[in-house]
């Protein structure tokens, strides 16, 4: 579930800068559109006719006013705005209108693109790189893009993704029949690993049942997987959470793939098997995660070979589809959700620089704002037990059918993902609770999991304990006729108790995405928007877009709830 960067609550000042950058980009496009005398689509979605010079000036002023209004807004994000602006603009006018500074910003946001431009230009000179940039297609520029300098990870270049069975940006967005993009046979898949052709690197299969090898993976991820843009926080994937996420039912040792240089583990990628439901079709697939390359090796283009090798190993098992997520724009997201954060220990989050204090407020007020009751209020609320699993499995199965993109769990998987087993893990990772009514029926459940972040070089605090919203379900969703108001109230009651329980277990912040029915309770429970996005991708499967729970302005959309019901760790 975490993106490939540490999402944090939005700083209003940064949001304003992002909006201004978007406005600047749109203004840069305007003169070229005016000079061409062609029709241009206005901000209100209607075509504006290019008329006389005076009309052009009037339209230009109108455009500037709209851009000014946008720059004052704190609702847009750089990633959504810039990619949308580029994708919808006329390619020639959009690229020719960019200043050298704006081009450099795009290159800085996209390490894979930078490598391709250097190779294409045959020179490290700035002018040559700029000219190579202007020759690209819009979709090539978008591929690998990340907002605000985040995700400085090489997730493979646009040239690589153009060769893969994934939907491309330049395909028409019309409604189409969903299904596999490429049909293959196991006998056509090579037995041997993808050639590395890079001495002294070699492929290895990591045995995560071996404590030493597990610690190697943990160390690599800690140092090189996720870090926020300012290098203030770093995700700390413990042995317990790695066992939980990478050794789920049906896991295969061969799907834990590493690259060594000598004895040093310098790259890793993993997958676990999962059934994926896309609307009315169930796919035998895999969940790919933890693509990590040592920072010093990011220029070696190891990402494409890691992706090819994990794909080869999965294909050898007769599995052809996969689901994966990331904060980077790749061809082509089936859905995009936004991160939201709810402070549980606001004072600590403020001290470490995670939560900003609004300019019109004071720390003492923020502490009061996020204070929680000591006791939960839902009658019959208790921890999940083994005896509850059949009922919870049935409830979750029915609840997930309300969404378009979900996992399909069997009883064993439900137990693995939701039940804490004290004898299996050194620390508790998953926290699950049920509501039992007077008759003994399980009517609701919710869950969240632990992912700790190290606070780098802070004199007082060394870690942040973050709770991530996992799966939940309630019988209230199945009342006839459907009562959205009742569902909203029930979810708010449950999530208010989830916050209290997380606080009781010494969590500092509660994180959630805009997926499932979360839009019904996030703002009401004082979750604030984060600066992180999570894009959902399907490999070798073409699916129509699925709503991510936010509108075009990147705000929660209570009227059109998310179709995503897949929570990835």
Swiss-Prot record:
Example GO BP: protein localization to membrane
Keyword field: Acyltransferase, Cytoplasm, Transferase
Catalytic activity: N-terminal glycyl-[protein] + tetradecanoyl-CoA = N-tetradecanoylglycyl-[protein] + CoA + H(+)
EC number: 2.3.1.97
Domain of life: Eukaryota
InterPro entries assigned to the protein according to its UniProt record, in alphabetical order: Acyl_CoA_acyltransferase (IPR016181), NMT (IPR000903), NMT_C (IPR022677), NMT_CS (IPR022678), NMT_N (IPR022676)
UniProt-listed Pfam families: NMT, NMT_C
GO cellular component entries: cytosol
Subunit relationships: Monomer.
Family under the similarity heading: Belongs to the NMT family.
Protein name listed in UniProt: Glycylpeptide N-tetradecanoyltransferase
Organism the protein comes from: Neurospora crassa (strain ATCC 24698 / 74-OR23-1A / CBS 708.71 / DSM 1257 / FGSC 987)
């Amino acid at each position: 579930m975490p993106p490939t960067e540490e999402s944090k609550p939005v700083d209003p000042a940064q949001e304003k800068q992002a909006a201004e950058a978007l406005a600047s980009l749109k203004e840069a496009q305007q003169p070229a559109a005016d000079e061409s005398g062609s029709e241009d689509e206005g901000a209100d979605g209607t075509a504006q006719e290019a008329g006389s010079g005076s009309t052009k000036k009037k339209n230009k002023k109108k455009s500037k006013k709209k851009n000014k209004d946008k720059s004052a807004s704190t609702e847009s994000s750089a990633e959504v705005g810039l990619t949308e602006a580029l994708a919808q603009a006329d390619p020639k006018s959009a690229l020719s209108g960019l200043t050298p500074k704006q081009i450099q910003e795009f290159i800085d946001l996209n390490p894979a693109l930078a490598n391709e431009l250097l190779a294409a230009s045959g020179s490290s000179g700035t002018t040559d790189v700029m000219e190579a940039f202007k020759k690209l297609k819009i979709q090539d520029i978008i591929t690998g893009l990340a907002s605000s300098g985040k995700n400085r990870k090489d997730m493979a270049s646009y040239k690589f993704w153009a060769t893969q069975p994934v939907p491309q940006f330049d395909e028409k967005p019309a409604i189409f029949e969903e299904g596999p993009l490429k049909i293959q046979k196991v006998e056509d898949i090579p037995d041997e690993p993808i050639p590395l052709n890079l001495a002294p690197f070699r492929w290895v299969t990591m045995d995560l049942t071996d404590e030493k090898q597990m610690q190697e993976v943990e160390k690599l991820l800690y140092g090189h997987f996720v870090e926020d843009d300012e290098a203030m926080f770093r995700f700390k994937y413990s042995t317990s959470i790695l066992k939980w996420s990478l050794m789920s039912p049906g896991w295969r040792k061969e799907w834990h793939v590493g690259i060594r240089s000598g004895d040093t583990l310098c790259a890793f990628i993993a997958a676990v098997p999962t059934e994926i439901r896309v609307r009315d079709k169930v796919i035998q697939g895999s969940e790919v995660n933890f693509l990590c390359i040592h920072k010093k090796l990011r220029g070696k283009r190891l990402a494409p070979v890691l992706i090819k090798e994990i794909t080869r190993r999965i294909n050898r098992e007769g599995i052809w589809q996969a689901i994966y997520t990331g904060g980077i724009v790749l061809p082509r997201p089936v859905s995009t959700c936004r991160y939201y954060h709810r402070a549980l220990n606001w004072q600590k989050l403020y001290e470490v620089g995670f939560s900003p204090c609004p300019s019109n407020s004071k720390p003492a007020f923020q502490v009061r704002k996020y204070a929680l009751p000591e006791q939960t209020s839902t009658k019959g609320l208790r921890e999940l037990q083994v005896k509850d699993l059949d009922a919870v499995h049935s409830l979750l199965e029915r609840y997930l059918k309300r969404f378009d993109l979900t996992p399909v769990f069997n009883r064993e998987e439900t137990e693995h993902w939701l039940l804490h087993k004290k004898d299996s893990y050194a620390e508790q990772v998953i926290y699950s609770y049920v509501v039992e009514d007077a008759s003994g029926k399980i009517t609701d459940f919710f869950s969240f999991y632990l992912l700790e972040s190290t606070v780098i070089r802070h004199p007082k605090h060394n870690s942040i304990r973050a709770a991530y919203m996992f799966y939940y379900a309630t019988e209230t969703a199945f009342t006839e006729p459907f009562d959205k108001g009742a569902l909203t109230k029930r979810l708010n009651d449950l999530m208010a108790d989830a916050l209290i329980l997380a606080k009781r277990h010494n969590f500092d912040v509660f994180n959630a995405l805009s997926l499932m029915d979360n839009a019904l309770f996030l703002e009401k429970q004082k979750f604030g928007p984060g600066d992180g996005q999570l894009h959902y991708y399907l490999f070798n499967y073409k699916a129509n877009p699925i709503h991510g729970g936010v509108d075009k302005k990147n705000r929660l959309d209570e009227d059109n709830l998310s179709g995503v019901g897949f929570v990835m760790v």
